[in-house]
Design a protein with these regions (language model features):
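Conserved catalytic cores of phosphodiester-cleaving nucleases, focusing on short active-site segments
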Residues: 86
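Basic, Lys/Arg-enriched alpha-helical interface segments
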Residues: 1-70, 79-82, 92-118
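Residue-level signal for short, function-critical loop segments
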Residues: 89
């Protein structure tokens, strides 16, 4: 099985939204998310529910729960083995907010464009 590498998306002004999100979460949630990221690196696109779910347009969500708090980190696959983490949020409803998916899609397009121009 191919091992995967997690890459944190950075904005054009070098801000890493997922790292900012992680710093804002409590320590238990952060630890759970970190463990799930390790599992994702190992299993990549073979990881399924309850840990990972395909949403649409190449966007997936990493699913984490700690107590009553539910977190999601959206990501996509790039190249042979890269997992690009685009944004994270605390989930308040059963459905993943459309604005979060749209943000992930915008960041995916931005990332791919910047990689093509390297």
């Amino acid at each position: 099985m191919t091992s995967f590498e997690i890459v944190f998306y950075k904005t054009s002004n070098n801000i890493c939204p997922v790292k900012v999100f992680l710093l804002d979460t409590d320590i238990k949630m952060r630890a759970k998310i970190s463990s799930l990221m390790e599992i994702l690196e190992e299993y990549g696109n073979f990881l399924r529910e309850p840990y990972s779910k395909y949403l649409r347009d190449g966007i997936f969500e990493l699913r984490c729960q700690s107590g009553n708090n539910i977190s999601r980190i959206l990501y996509f696959f790039y190249g042979d083995n890269k997992i690009i983490m685009t944004n994270g949020f605390i989930k308040k409803t059963n459905k993943t907010p459309k604005k979060e998916i749209e943000l992930a899609k915008l960041r995916k397009a931005d990332y791919i464009e910047r990689m093509m121009n390297k």
